[in-house]
UniProtKB/Swiss-Prot annotation:
Name by which UniProt lists this protein: RNA-editing ligase 2, mitochondrial
Quaternary state and interactors: Component of the RNA editing complex, a 1600 kDa complex composed of at least 20 proteins.
Family as reported in the entry's similarity comment: Belongs to the RNA ligase 2 family.
Lineage start: Eukaryota, Discoba, Euglenozoa, Kinetoplastea, Metakinetoplastina
Species name: Trypanosoma brucei brucei (strain 927/4 GUTat10.1)
Segment annotated as transit peptide: 1-17
GO cellular component: kinetoplast; mitochondrial mRNA editing complex; mitochondrion; mRNA editing complex
Reaction equations catalysed: ATP + (ribonucleotide)n-3'-hydroxyl + 5'-phospho-(ribonucleotide)m = (ribonucleotide)n+m + AMP + diphosphate
Subcellular location field: Mitochondrion
Length: 416
């Protein structure tokens, strides 16, 4: 087994700690799990058809980055409070150069946007990584010097899934700020935060997996949602079987907007059953999918939903090529595939919608790969797998929408 040892040094620096009033630290509110009762409450208060934004819920540790006006030092917080600089928290110190760059850039852009100085700027996010059990990925053991002592960088989560990277990373999902020391924190609306995040080179942030009315978001199957993170942190060519995501964080699109007066919950967790923290059985029996009925009704209403393509493919050139690939799934190509098959498989009732969709998807991929650039053909394995899934999905949707007409046209008695 390969092992690498890396050491980073950080000098202990004095910290001006927060006073007893806790005016700097902003505890990140716990998010309620979704269930049928809470979804029905959204319907009852008229928020069900509002726009909602779902991002991947990363399995890690809550982590905040604080920039305070007049202080040169950046502060870092876990869920329970701001940490002294010598506290060992999974080895986050190794990320400090990047974290400082992120918060400095966000502060500059936000102050420019607000056209005023801000007392505190805060990026909320998740610290994650430290485990990736793939035979082609070397096991790593890194240490970082904290207060003159070597401390081992440890995995934030040790479950068999989801696994993201052998290294430690930060995933940003919120921006908050205080104009004055005595003021309250203001949360940026999701789209405003994303506008700033995407302008910071190297910053990993919560992109929308799916957005729209809750009827559309709830049709997304979190039970079969493969994490989108590994390709973003260099693991795209090292797929893991069953690397399911923890779930989604679903926010109201107007959360943080001035004047927004919600009548119901504005943030919910849609968690994979494997990550439910309680059982509905008093005897702690098998976990159940509390969203099963809601998801079934939503699928009947909005259809099965896949992640937005932009959350899977983030390179602009690859994204454009991916959209072109999906444009190959069209009615004219379906007619061409049918002409190659003939009528006999339909006469003998041997052809099913899934079989026809598979033939269509294969034809799409064959033609696309024949004409596309080598750089697109050689995209990471995980992204290739995702794109194949999208092609099959779109092929099935097209075939199913025309199946009755296809059966009619493939009948030997059909005439124009």
């Amino acid at each position: 087994m390969l092992r690498r040892l890396g050491v980073r040094h950080f000098r202990r620096t004095p910290l001006l700690f927060v006073g007893g009033d806790g005016s700097i630290f902003e505890r990140y509110t716990e998010i309620d799990n979704s269930n049928e009762r809470r979804i029905n409450a959204l319907k009852g208060c008229g928020m069900f058809e509002d726009e909602w934004i779902a991002t991947e819920k990363v399995h890690g540790a809550n982590f905040g980055i604080y920039s305070i006006e007049g202080e040169k030092m950046i502060r870092y917080a876990k869920r329970s409070g701001i940490m002294p600089p010598n506290e060992h928290f999974f080895g986050y110190h190794i990320l400090i150069p990047e974290l400082q760059r992120y918060i400095t850039s966000i502060r500059e852009m936000l102050c420019e946007k607000q056209k005023k100085k801000l007392h505190v700027v805060l990026i909320n996010g998740e610290l994650f990584g430290g485990k990736y059990d793939h035979p082609s990925v070397p096991k790593t053991r890194k240490t970082v010097m904290v207060a003159g002592k070597p401390r081992t960088i440890s995995a934030v989560q040790t479950d068999s899934f989801p696994q993201y990277s052998p290294d430690l990373h930060f995933y940003a999902f919120d921006i908050k700020y205080k104009e004055t020391e005595d003021g309250d924190y203001t949360t940026l609306v999701y789209d405003e935060a994303i506008e700033l995040f995407q302008r910071v080179p190297g910053l990993l942030y919560a992109r929308a997996v799916i957005r729209g009315p809750m009827s559309k978001v709830a049709a997304f199957d979190v039970e079969r949602f493969v994490t989108t993170i590994p390709p973003l942190v260099g693991m795209g060519n090292y797929p893991l079987t069953g690397n399911w995501a923890e779930g989604l964080v679903v926010k109201h699109s107007r959360l943080g907007m001035a004047g927004f007066d919600p009548k119901g919950p504005t943030v919910l967790k849609f968690k994979c059953t494997a990550f439910q923290e309680i059982s509905t059985d008093r005897a702690q029996g098998p976990r159940v999918d509390e969203m099963r009925n809601v998801r079934r009704d939503s699928i009947n209403r909005a259809g099965v939903q896949l992640p937005d393509l932009e959350s899977i493919v983030q390179d602009p050139i690859q994204l454009e090529a991916s959209k072109l690939l999906l444009n190959h799934v069209c009615e004219n190509r379906l007619k061409n595939v049918l002409s190659k098959i003939g009528t006999e498989p339909f006469e003998k009732e041997e052809m099913t919608p899934d079989q026809l969709a598979t033939l269509l998807a294969k034809d799409v991929l064959k033609d696309f790969l024949k004409d596309t650039e080598p750089s697109i053909v050689n995209i990471p394995v995980l992204i290739r797998k995702d794109l194949t899934r999208y092609v099959i999905f779109e092929s099935r949707r097209l075939v199913c929408s025309q199946w009755k007409d296809i059966l009619k046209r493939q009948s030997p008695d059909f005439s124009e």
